[in-house]
From Swiss-Prot:
It is a single-pass type I membrane protein. GO terms for molecular function: NAD+ nucleosidase activity, cyclic ADP-ribose generating; transmembrane signaling receptor activity; triacyl lipopeptide binding. This is Toll-like receptor 2. One of its GO terms (cellular component) is receptor complex. It comes from the Eukaryota. GO terms for biological process: cellular response to diacyl bacterial lipopeptide; cellular response to triacyl bacterial lipopeptide; inflammatory response; innate immune response; toll-like receptor signaling pathway. The lineage of its organism: Eukaryota, Metazoa, Chordata, Craniata, Vertebrata. Belongs to the Toll-like receptor family. Residues 21-587 are extracellular. Residues 609-784 are cytoplasmic. There is a cross-link at residue 754 (Glycyl lysine isopeptide (Lys-Gly) (interchain with G-Cter in ubiquitin)). The record marks 349 as: Interaction with bacterial lipopeptide. Residues 1-20 form the signal peptide.
Length: 784
């Protein structure tokens, strides 16, 4: 019994483990190229069943705690492995041994407390390694990265427990494109720890305090291109000139991101610019200046310039004591060599005239997303200000008058590129004055409704996208590039206005078509972006766009952004794929063919009507319909005649001289209705026939060869037949005046054939001795 229980328990464990493995494998989604996505699936282990077909595996943001030797042993072709943001605390020694093709490994933000070089000893192809955010204190007792000759990006450290950097830590790394070290609580830096790396393109340091910053600079200043300092409080920073004054430096760019300065530490940073002579570019991003800008008492006057700094970028600068800030006149002399200045989102409302005049080498000035207005711009662009300025960016400020803005910039004689986008100009005056060398103008997102001759004729590049323009009719003879997307244009501009245009971007308007002739009229056009419009996919438009193989070289967003808006059955389809029917594309030909077919049909109908008496049948149909509208049975008081006599005019002698004499002069007499005598003059003959038949008790048909040839006799026969069959009575009396062969009766007298087949008829005897009996039978038939 215990053995049976043990066996059952083992099988239950096996089944549950198989179900778990199946569930985890199903948590992965893999495409045919071997890219598997399993991030954010609440996995607690690496799914089993992974094969050599997996090229990329993303298991980030799960609950994985352990990586074993078997988990990835079959993934020999794996190139990308993401295990970040898990709970991994243990990685077995040979877990990555089989991943010889691995190029990207992310183990960041786990719970690894110890790092082992054995993890990486077979990863010769590894180019990217991220170990940030784990809980280790050091990078291990031996060199971690000595077996990674192709490593180009390395991220190590954490914000709390990583406290030591030793000389062995980066041994074996010769060249890195990017090295990021998160060491906010760094306490020990052994000199020359970073010196083993002969070349670093970009070093990112997260340091809370600058205590060890100079020691690190000493080691890297000769092998580094760009140093980025993040999340650092430089209040106590002090630069020692003796440290690096005699060393060959290669640092070209300094970036301070989320760094705090004081007036004193800012001066120390400026000293650094002087002594690290290779620095060409300095960037301050989201920094805070905890001071009032009073540098006069801080020996700043002994610094003559900012070294070789040519580019200065400041974004989102915070100055808590802004309203106590000094005029910065003490730093004016330092700016003479600066060529490019960017100050974005820093609440700048004025550049003092004196500072503008000191910026004698300035070629590029970007004051985007600030508070500049025409009133302050007048002071900033004063006489002799920015004498060599070529590009001025005033995007998203508080400018309102285009005319005034142009006049204020007349002092900038070398200005050729002006960006005043995202200002609320709303309207444009008829005339404006601009610097004489203006070649580029950006007026996008300025809410203008129309363009006027205010724009300078010297323009080569014009951007008026994202406005309310519904037409473009300006003559700009030198314009080469036009950006006019996101407006309300209904057609392409006239090419005669823009004779040298080579680039036009006119997407997201309400253009519904353009033709080959329009494109050909732009003789120098090389690039056209016209997608996102509401195209009417007419036959001509489709023929042009689908038939021009070279069109794709001009239309840069072809074919993805070109979609039909109408006709409705192709709406949403790509213009390249839309197809119209023959009737839509050749309407004139189809209409002509239809008319010809209709004419032939009418002609054929006419021939058939003539051949088969169609016109006669139509007349009879009309007469029958008229008869159908009459009451089905006349009331008794409307019966005026004993019999209506239907006969041919050629048989009138027999009817009038024999029948009338025998019936109307008999005692009691019969009252007959004859068309010659009793039809009402002026009344339509069809109505006379119908009324006479309906007012007669019987209808007598005098049949002869002449009868079957008579049209009116046929009408009378039809109406009588209507009463005979539709009213279900016995009103018809047939008199055969002469023998008639039934086969000789025309087909159109079908009713006569039916009556002769269904009713007994009286035959007029030639023998006079039998004629008395004929009249007796006829009188009896009328009375019945």
């Amino acid at each position: 019994m215990p053995r049976a229980l043990w066996t059952a328990w083992v099988w239950a464990v096996i089944i549950l483990s198989m179900e778990g493995a199946s569930h985890q494998a199903s948590s992965l989604s893999c495409d045919p190229t071997g890219v598997c996505d399993g991030h954010s699936r609440s996995l607690n282990s690496i799914p089993s069943g992974l094969t050599d077909g997996v090229k990329s595996l993303d298991l980030s943001n799960n609950e994985i705690t352990y990586v074993s030797n078997r988990d990835l042993q079959r993934c020999v072709n794996l190139k990308t492995l993401r295990l970040g943001a898990n709970e991994i605390h243990t990685v077995e020694e040979d877990s990555f041994f089989h991943l010889r093709n691995l190029e990207y490994l992310d183990l960041s933000y786990n719970r690894l407390s110890n790092l082992s070089s054995s993890w990486f000893r077979s990863l010769y192809a590894l180019k990217f390694l991220n170990l940030l955010g784990n809980v280790y204190k050091t990078l291990g007792e031996t060199s971690l990265f000595s077996h990674l000759p192709n490593l180009r990006t390395l991220k190590v450290g954490n914000s709390n427990s990583f406290t030591e950097i030793h000389e062995k830590d980066f041994t074996g790394l010769i060249f890195l494109e990017e090295l990021e070290i998160s060491a906010q609580n760094l306490q020990i830096y052994v000199p020359k720890s970073l010196k083993s790396i002969q070349n670093i393109s970009h070093l990112i340091l997260h340091l809370k305090q600058p205590v060890l910053l100079v020691d690190i600079l000493v080691d890297i200043v000769s092998s580094l291109d760009c140093l980025e300092l993040r999340d650092t409080n430089l209040h106590t920073f002090h630069f020692s000139e003796a440290s690096i004054s005699e060393m060959n430096t290669s640092v070209k760019k300094l970036i301070f991101r989320n760094v705090q300065f004081t007036d004193e530490s800012f001066v120390e940073v400026v000293k650094l610019f002087n002594y690290v002579s290779g620095i060409l570019e300095v960037e301050f991003d989201d920094c805070t200046h905890d001071g009032i800008g009073d540098f006069r008492a801080l020996s700043l006057d002994r610094i003559r310039h900012l070294g070789n700094v040519e580019t200065l970028t400041i974004r989102k600068l915070h100055i808590p004591q802004f309203f106590l800030f000094h005029d910065l006149s003490s730093i004016y002399p330092l700016t003479g060599k600066v060529k490019r200045v960017t100050i974005e989102s820093s609440k700048v409302f004025l550049v003092p005239c004196l500072l503008s005049q000191h910026l004698k080498s300035l070629e590029y000035l970007d004051l985007s997303e600030n508070l500049m207005s025409e009133e302050t711009l007048k002071n900033s662009a004063c006489k002799d200000a920015w004498p060599f300025l070529q590009t001025l960016v005033l995007r998203q400020n508080r400018l309102k008058s285009l005319e005034k803005t142009g006049e204020l910039l007349l002092t900038l004689e070398n200005l050729n590129n002006l960006d005043i986008s995202k200002n609320n100009f709303l309207s444009m005056p008829e005339t404006c004055r601009w610097p004489g060398k203006m070649k580029q103008l950006n007026l996008s997102s300025t809410r203008v409704h129309s363009l006027t001759q205010c724009l300078p004729q010297t323009l080569e590049i014009l951007d008026v996208s994202n406005n309310n323009l519904d037409s473009f009719s300006l003559i700009l003879p030198q314009l080469k590039e036009l950006y006019i997307s996101r407006n309300k244009l209904k057609t392409l501009p006239d090419a005669s206005f823009l004779p040298v245009l080579s680039v036009m971007r006119i997407s997201r308007n309400i253009i519904n078509t353009f033709s080959k002739e329009q494109l050909d009229s732009f003789q120098q056009l090389k690039t056209l972006e016209a997608g996102g419009n509401n195209f009417i996919c007419s036959c001509d438009f489709l023929s042009f766009t689908q038939g021009q193989q070279a069109l794709g070289r001009v239309l840069v967003d072809w074919p993805a952004e070109y979609r039909c808006d109408s006709p409705s059955h192709v709406r949403g389809q790509r213009v390249q794929d839309a197809r119209l029917s023959l009737s839509e594309c050749h309407r004139a030909a189809v209409v002509s063919a239809a008319c010809c077919a209709l004419f032939l049909l009418l002609l054929l109908t006419g021939v058939l009507c003539h051949r088969f008496h169609g016109l006669w049948y139509m007349k009879m149909m009309w007469a029958w319909l008229q008869a159908k509208r009459k009451p089905r049975k006349a009331p008794r008081r409307d019966i005026c005649y004993d019999a209506f006599v239907s006969y041919s005019e050629q048989d009138s002698y027999w009817v009038e001289n024999l029948m009338v004499q025998e019936l109307e002069h008999f005692n009691p007499p019969f009252k007959l209705c004859l068309h010659k005598r009793d039809f009402i003059p002026g009344k339509w003959i069809i109505d006379n026939i119908i009324d006479s038949i309906e007012k007669s008790h019987k209808t007598i048909f005098v049949l002869s060869e002449n009868f079957v040839k008579s049209e009116w006799c046929k009408y009378e026969l039809d109406f009588s037949h209507f009463r005979l069959f539709d009213e279900n009575n016995d009103a018809a009396i047939l008199i055969l005046l002469e023998p008639i062969d039934k086969k000789a009766i025309p087909q159109r007298f079908c009713k006569l054939r039916k009556i002769m087949n269904t009713k007994t008829y009286l035959e007029w005897p030639v023998d006079e001795t039998q004629q008395e009996g004929f009249w007796l039978n006829l009188r009896a038939a009328i009375r019945s």
